[in-house]
Amino acid sequence: MTISNTRPITPELIASHGLKPDEYERILSLIRREPTFTELGIFSAMWNEHCSYKSSKKWLRTLPTKGPRVIQGPGENAGVVDIDDGDCVVFKMESHNHPSYIEPYQGAATGVGGILRDVFTMGARPIAAMNALRFGAPDHPKTRHLVSGVVAGVGGYGNSFGVPTVGGEVEFDARYNGNILVNAFAAGLARSDAIFYSKAEGVGLPVVYLGAKTGRDGVGGATMASAEFDESIEEKRPTVQVGDPFTEKCLLEACLELMQTGAVIAIQDMGAAGLTCSAVEMGAKGDLGIELDLDKVPVREERMTAYEMMLSESQERMLMVLRPEKEEEAKAIFVKWGLDFAIVGKTTDDLRFRILHQGEEVANLPIKELGDEAPEYDRPWTPAKSPSPLATNDIPRADVAEALLKLVGSANNSSRRWVYEQYDTLIQGNSLQLPGGDAGVVRVEGHATKALAFSSDVTPRYVEADPFEGGKQAVAECWRNLTATGALPLAATDNLNFGNPERPEIMSQFVHAIKGIGEACRALDFPIVSGNVSLYNETNGQGILPTPTIGGVGLISDWARMARIRFAAADEAILLAGAPEGWGTHIAQSVYMRDVHGRTDGPAPHVDLAHERKVGDFVRGLIADGLVTAVHDCSSGGLALAVAEMAMASGIGATIEAPAGHDPIAAFYGEDQGRYVVTVTAEKLEAIASRARDAGLSLPVIGTTGGSAVKLGDAKAVSVEELRSTHEAWFPTYMGGDLAPDN
């Protein structure tokens, strides 16, 4: 059914477009008349949270975004960071949460496709992908279906496109029952002097449509992504886009080939709000108007209206401002790759966004007010409240060995092999570390020694307990995971997933998490260069756990010295860098409390950023000098889980002493921050100990590698074979239709 552009504008229609009454009044004052139906759709798309960041912009400005290596920070399709030798890494993380809940395969697949386009739009060839996934409780009736669809979608698109998936996260919690999270990360390599931007320059230049044809899929997708769900969720299935990775691969090659010709003045991928957002952003950034003739847009469906064409989120499409003299050369490239190439408009000097369709003007709007001058809110938020500490006598006991087996086989700590074996982790032939370690590592092609490390991290239960400390911890753990490979952390991207910002308690979570993220990034010289905000992650008023995911990139100057988590050999000393007295103290909000005792009370662990930096720099120095044989950061599950993971990765056991006079539960399962487990050969032990003394760092020897079991203090030994079988069993058992007991 076609929709007339003269459809009456009623309060119900305005509300259905996600516009508040005061926002509609602002529209009337801007254009001094009633908008057409197409214009209402354009305002709805550009003024929603997904495109305008109207609730978050104020706080995003407080984040550190500059640094000596930063070539491009937030505001472009992706961030760009210098990695020496004239090379740069281009990267970003973005959410596709709402579509993936409604239609998990296509939602996840097009999330991958969208983030890859963000990267190659800048002129970079994608070299790595990650995904951070959050699902509802394992026993929820939709969870297994959603896991299956999302993982298949991520793999189906990424594998076909030809980019290795080198890391990510998968976590379950009942708070995601009605609103899962799919956060997709991509990184690419480019030359520092060949970066392409979205700012249009020059009047009267052709605006060119590139890629696949436009259909009705995804119409209204950006508006849907800016609202919480209710019982009408199934009706939103048509707003989910459909992806074709093979077309995207052709689009990548065509764009990179075109970029070498000097034809491109500005280029923008068509993501959220499709043709509308890409055209408005290009024009508004360049202080230019844009005129589009929709009769020239390649379409794959009949009788498409102006409203549908402007708001379609059909995938694998680009918009470009072209040098006129290069038109035939550019067209030939896209024809060769089997893609559409159509001049659909021109740049103008009047700062108007003008849309023509079938000989009529269907929209004529001020472009700056649609783009970078959209509404901005300073939403109310409540002061932070920190939970009371747990009393010493309120820490429940459990057998240390039995707790370890329970944790390694639990829903949230078990092996993710079932997931990542569905992804191509080796394509392109440059992967050096695969999922399952602290960070994925990819060799920089064409360079003998250089590699890049990638990690994504957040601990939502910490953010829920204390958004400020949780925000700090997300950054610190990402930085720590990169460091644990030997990489120098360069910069980060954020994917900020929260509930309804109109609720002051949710806005408070957001504000304090941003403050924590900013403080940590400044302390660790880890600027935020790109990112995404996803709000209204709620269903029927039930919000998700606050989940500000941090994706980070680090540089390894010599990958031959790169560290791994697996024990290298028997009879090596195990040390705990950055250990507090007693090795571990903070048991509140730990997975021990959550998964063994079903409790999520108490404060999040404090992150001492000066300590974090000092210990991380020290460990990175040990790795660079070849003094350690294995490294693993201590995070969820504490020392016990870190040692178990190192043993399972290598097949070599470990004996850990219990710290005299200290609680073994806190020592083994405490989640104190800023710690690394390292292993050292006997002949290098004294040299490392001397370094630690000179640096004023705690570096106790806590045990020895060897044997076929892991023994923690006085607890019974658990064989590595039993740990492995328990660790590997949960996911395939669950996905096979049997819910593992007690999880």
Curated annotation (Swiss-Prot):
Residues reported to bind Mg(2+) 2: D118, D269
GO molecular function: ATP binding; magnesium ion binding; phosphoribosylformylglycinamidine synthase activity
The keyword tRNA processing appears for this protein: no
Residues at the catalytic site: H50, H96
Pathway assignment: Purine metabolism; IMP biosynthesis via de novo pathway; 5-amino-1-(5-phospho-D-ribosyl)imidazole from N(2)-formyl-N(1)-(5-phospho-D-ribosyl)glycinamide: step 1/2
Record: residues binding ATP: Y53, K92, D494, G531
Listed HAMAP family: PurL_2
Descriptive protein name: Phosphoribosylformylglycinamidine synthase subunit PurL
Naturally occurring in which organism (per UniProt): Sinorhizobium fredii (strain HH103)
The organism's taxonomic lineage, starting at the top: Bacteria, Pseudomonadati, Pseudomonadota, Alphaproteobacteria, Hyphomicrobiales
Gene: purL
